[in-house]
Amino acid sequence: LINKNAACLEDKYRQLVDSLENQGVEVVIPGNGQTESDNIWYEEFLAMKILIDFVDNVEEAIDRINTYSGGHSTAILTENNETATEFMEQVDSAAVYHNASTRFTDGGQMGVGAELAISTDKLHHRGPLGLEQLVTNKYYVYGDGHIRD
């Protein structure tokens, strides 16, 4: 989800799409004939595929994510710490990231050891699941463009 009011939106958007497509990522944009309904928002792609849409503000992004997300991990890329804090506190995901890749949502990376499974449920544990996770947790991860290879 991209804020419609972002500075230099057209140039940054075109650069993003070109970069993704050059890496072999299929870019899906609602409303341009690629998707017939809102059902695509519920789909987990499990492929080099991304869904891009625009929102008016962070509140709309939070609402969209909380409506359609599976609750595993969610990230925001912004230099505005207030916006990031609001996003991270309001998004209903097991792990929330500010300027870091969601690929860090892994048992070894989160310090719980080898994963037995992944849970997005709120009863007992959400996120990477190890033997000691018997309470609900929400992980807050802050970065500066960090990725995981």
State each model region's role.
Residues 1-101:
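NAD(P)-dependent aldehyde/semialdehyde dehydrogenase
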Residues 79-149:
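C-terminal segments
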